[in-house]
Amino acid sequence: MAGHDVKYGKHRTRRSFSRIKEVIGLPNLIEVQTLSYKNFLDEGLANVFKEMFPIDNFAGTMELEFVGYEMKTPKYTVEEARAHDANYSAPIYVTFRLVNKETGELKTQEVFFGDFPLMTEMGTFINNGSERLIVSQLVRSPGSYFHLKTDKNGLESFGHTTIPNRGAWFELDTDAKGIGYVRIDRTRKLTFTTMLRALGFGSDDEILELLGETQLLTDTIAKDVHKNPADTRVEEALKDIYDRLRPGEPKTADSSRGLLVARFFDPKRYDFAPVGRYKFNKKLALKNRLLGLTLAEPIVDPETGEILVNTDTLVTRDVLDLIEPLLDNGLGNFVVEPSDDAVIPEPITLQSIKVYSPKDSERVVTLLSNGNPDSECRVLTPADVISNISYWLGLAEGIGKVDDIDHLGNRRIRSVGELLQNQVRIGLSRMERVIRERMSSSENENITPQGLINIRPVTASIKEFFGSSQLSQFMDQHNPLSELSHKRRFSALGPGGISRDRASYEVRDVHYTHYGRMCPIETPEGPNIGLINNLSSYAKVNEYGFIMSPYRRVDRVNGIVTDEVEYLTADEEDNYTVAQANSPLTDDSRFANETVMARHTGNNIEVEASTADYMDVSPKQVIAVAAACIPFLENDDSNRALMGANMQRQAVPLIDPHAPWIGTGMEHQTARDSGAALLAKHAGVVEYVDGNEIRVRRTSGELDIYNITKYRRSNSGTSYNQRPLARLGEKVEKNDIIADGPSMENGEMALGQNPLVAYMTWEGYNFEDAVIMSERLIKDDVYTSIAIEEYESETRDTKLGPEEITREIPNVGDEALKNLDESGIIRIGAEVKDGDLLVGKVTPKGETDPTPEERLLRAIFGEKAREVRDTSLRVPHGGGGIVHDVRVFTRENGDELPSGVNKLVRVFIAQKRKIHVGDKMAGRHGNKGVVSNIVPVEDMPYLPDGTPIDIMLNPLGVPSRMNIGQVMELHLGMAARTLGIHIATPVFDGASDEDIWDTVKEAGMAADAKTVLYDGRTGEPFDNRISVGVMYMIKLHHMVDDKLHARSVGPYSLVTQQPLGGKAQFGGQRFGEMEVWALEAYGAANVLQEILTYKSDDVIGRTRAYEAIVKGERIPKPGLPESFRVLVKELQSLGLDMKVLDADRNVLDLRELDEDEVMTRPDNTEITPEMLEAQEAIVAQAEAEEEALINADIEK
């Protein structure tokens, strides 16, 4: 027997065909969210306060200090926040100390700082009752970047950009004449020597001595002449810079100093962030530039005076290892003194080393570095500017490297914590202004911290971020895999990122550094391709936001691949050679072959085993979680694998899910980490189980009670339902799955079912990827899912009195009210159809003055009931089902309702959706299709033993698509079902051809795994043997019930008076320009006329036509379409006097409908201004919904 048994969780054993030992398990798959937020609460939040405080007043007599903060217990639990449409958040209290420097008086006070959103255990936030999450953002890292440019004449030159986290950019560039320029914050350029002079190096000789002679430097100095002898060179340079930054303003050297300090050297205005300083020091450090160069001076140990490395030595990795500690300790450091009128007249520490130029072995080049400033230094320093210029000049000599901006060493992840930290910082900086003003304007005696602080800017900033940021998204909750995938997603779009329209192919493309960090497969199709990506399965994010991938260290001395795992960032990995995960190893963990396939800076090379530094930990570290759930992924074309991974995320949870016979071994951990399953918080013994709760007695004796979620509506309108998995008396460990979530079975992800599939054509019904299905799948509810829709009705106070929820509704018979309770709300369990009442509601109508006759009648018969109109909530088209839950919120019960709302009723309707013709289905290999025919079981082809086939797929869907994985899954699935075993075939390390055929043979199937099929209608065998097997098929969220739609009497657009479009607006089908051409070509004049008039926007004509049909008269001639009148009005608004003439050249009156002219609806009732208002509201709502849909599509 091939393969070995592996236990996944407590409830499933699979036969695994993996051959590679994995030395490390998968990390917790949502830690990218949870760790970031935890870090924010532990450190990030306090750091922002420490950055912003203390705040002084303008006179410097008072100071407000930050002492600390405390988070109190949340007002609502997660479930309560969901039910009440509230936020899951905790009040935060910050302690401030106000110091009066004149009197020495201290006032300490705790200030309420608003409610701060809390993250749930699943990595999400509850915002207004719905579950949202913050998608991480992939952005350019702050740092120092160099690039190569080629102009149109083919001349190469180098450029440089310093990108801060916050603040002005600093750029260096060369023009066609070979002169170097500097640009400050994208303004006009200046010679770069001007910047050096401003830093205090006034004379040409000082600059040449500092940087060494190069062609670029001497040419630039020649161009940079002393224009105004009255100023020193430093002052003239300062004025030149001021003139560029503030053109037209009077310039002085002092104002320029102040401006330059504010632009680059002031921590309030300029910030590198720790990551920027780390990248900067790393780029400019001498140790990272010396490899492969020849030294032009000896390296001497400063303590002993011993010469460690002689002149003319080539710096190899071993030499570098020897001198690296000395360079870190300041070898080659020297101090230069700028002139007294410099921007910052303080000594500058630099580090230097002399080497020979690679382009001219006689030339000595001095490399300068910034002396490695401390990581606390978050601003640019003069040493940084000088060493940047030195590096830039060195590039022309062939020293140093240009940067690739798409390299993952230069792009970093901003996770939840950092994004929130930035929002708090924005809020605090707005607040700081207010505090300063209040400090200055208030009387000193009675001022308190509470009186100074207005928290609104901070709370508004956070609210805005959660409500409307591009990165705050409505969680994709189709199934647990889509939840998990959404939490691990990161986007290059959003504030501070790139825009979809400007994104080049290079940004979107797969880069070699994505290996083990970002999935090359899972990305959306369409305009966002390559801009939205997923984290690879083993990847982690380090403290600076760079993605790390794990590797096994190779002990090169002994030639052993150790089990020690190191996480490397992309730029660290560039220094090493990494062997592939499938390199054969001996029993004592040595490479079995003399040579191994390895990667080095993007090249796949065969190297001697002794030169490999690391080895991959697992073959599936390359790809993301969704792609790792596709068996035989290695046999699929990547485009189809992309579709397969994306479509698994659209699977609908079924009533009775089954895990796949052929899995990849990822199903268990995906289910556990998704947050949809119920996990044991502590080890213990199960004491009680029912459908609603599980009680576990801990080993310490305490009792844990777990509530099970039943049939809750998910964000996507699917049913979120948990089923107990633990049994009475069972021992459970911490983090064991004790209840399956939606789309789970026995603790494993179960997105679909395992039907019997045949690749064959049948009467042409599976043309173009269509799917033919057996009636059995409907009868046995194999692909039945539950959709839950939520409807709400609220009563408000109107000008004419309050609205009311009641059974007493005008003009409604008893039959329609039979399912409403005494208060007018539908009962739970009622079966409702389209148009049925859910909540009876009446709104007061404006009354006219009664006539004398009416007054007399009222006097005789008492006060008549007030005039009300029916505004009840009814079931919309296609919304019928069973009332599953009703929730009533009122002020009396202490529920928080929006202002003006007195009562809110929510009704949940559940629909059992069996699979229909028109529903979309898919396998896991991108093989998608629409159900085209549902055939009775007796007509389906059957196996020799009489078993009917469940699904027929078109064999033409395989060859051109090159997703052969589906065929391998089919054969192995049949063998697995016959043997009654579940199989795991991990990605890139799964069952080989031999394994498949051995298993097929073990199951007693035919050698070619095909079979004879018999036609169910005739009993005759089909001509050829047919591939039949078990394939995992999923039903997708694109269900025909949500899309089928037909208009009867519906709303019209207010301006053009044409029918609205779209299902949400109960709109019509657009008869567009091309369709009109078709009718014109056909000569169908009457059809064309009524389509352009009665059926569209001839307001009077359509009303008259309706009346004529009702009365059985001839339909009158159509009038003028409303849109024509709109066109005429638009032309008149341009000042063109346009008149419309009839055949006799009489001017037609395009008068507007008068108020008193009766407009009637097709049902002959009068059109009132309220109706027009309501219609206007419907149109506005429709447009808003359409915009929301478009935005949602864009997000996808």
From Swiss-Prot:
E.C. numbers: 2.7.7.6
UniProt keyword terms in alphabetical order: DNA-directed RNA polymerase, Nucleotidyltransferase, Transcription, Transferase
Reaction(s) catalysed by this chain's protein: RNA(n) + a ribonucleoside 5'-triphosphate = RNA(n+1) + diphosphate
Any Pfam family: RNA_pol_Rpb2_2
GO cellular component: DNA-directed RNA polymerase complex
Key word Cytoplasm present: no
Domain of life: Bacteria
Single GO MF descriptor: DNA binding
KW rRNA processing (keyword) present: no
NCBIfam families: PRK00405.1, rpoB
Free-text function comment from the UniProt entry: DNA-dependent RNA polymerase catalyzes the transcription of DNA into RNA using the four ribonucleoside triphosphates as substrates.
Record text on subunit structure and interactions: The RNAP catalytic core consists of 2 alpha, 1 beta, 1 beta' and 1 omega subunit. When a sigma factor is associated with the core the holoenzyme is formed, which can initiate transcription.
Family: Belongs to the RNA polymerase beta chain family.
Name of the protein: DNA-directed RNA polymerase subunit beta
Originating species: Lactococcus lactis subsp. cremoris (strain MG1363)
